């Protein structure tokens, strides 16, 4: 099975309140940077053949050095991201399309992951890739723990309460067969359409495509705010403890 992964890692961490536009991927958790954890997970995933990373221009060389020094041989390209996350992914897909044309080999699946989700596990990546290749699309998600309500007629009041049993919190990596993901992004670029995730684009342009759910644990958080760092430390410690028990 051949899988190609895209990692979107251009976030500057405004909500992290980092100085000088520092990338949140360079925050350390458990003695390693966030992006190190993410790179390692994809390096260790048996299904993944090549990884394309989009990041800030001043993070390209540090990321390349990190990959070299740690033997992350699956990191194929590290390029400058675009203005929006979707633009960054499109930049990576342009390179993937070129590779497909030159090699004549079509991947079984393309995965798109947030660089700031460092606790994804290699075996989870492999399973999402497998389901994506078999069914066309797969997205990891968790059941919400809290009750969710609509905002009412003004931001100061609530509207109706949503049925929590029918809700899922969506995460990454999101996986798709290459043809549909590439075409969805191509059409979105032509139409000037932006979405918050890749699944939304596939839903829009291929409504007949069912997107399969991979139910994820609560460890696969996105490092977004300062409070996420100590939570991440605890998650990492828990993951290490479980692995040592096995």
Curated annotation (Swiss-Prot):
Keywords in alphabetical order: Isoprene biosynthesis, Nucleotidyltransferase, Transferase
A GO biological-process term: isopentenyl diphosphate biosynthetic process, methylerythritol 4-phosphate pathway
InterPro entries xref list: IspD, IspD/TarI, IspD/TarI_cytidylyltransf_bact, ISPD_synthase_CS, Nucleotide-diphossugar_trans
Top-level lineage group: Bacteria
Pathway participation: Isoprenoid biosynthesis; isopentenyl diphosphate biosynthesis via DXP pathway; isopentenyl diphosphate from 1-deoxy-D-xylulose 5-phosphate: step 2/6
Pfam families, per the entry: IspD
Site feature (Positions MEP for the nucleophilic attack) residues: 164, 222
Protein name listed in UniProt: 2-C-methyl-D-erythritol 4-phosphate cytidylyltransferase
Function recorded in the entry: Catalyzes the formation of 4-diphosphocytidyl-2-C-methyl-D-erythritol from CTP and 2-C-methyl-D-erythritol 4-phosphate (MEP).
Organism: Chlorobaculum parvum (strain DSM 263 / NCIMB 8327)
Family: Belongs to the IspD/TarI cytidylyltransferase family. IspD subfamily.
Gene Ontology MF term list: 2-C-methyl-D-erythritol 4-phosphate cytidylyltransferase activity
EC code(s) of this entry: 2.7.7.60
Annotated site, Transition state stabilizer, chain positions: 15, 24
Reaction(s) catalysed (UniProt annotation): 2-C-methyl-D-erythritol 4-phosphate + CTP + H(+) = 4-CDP-2-C-methyl-D-erythritol + diphosphate
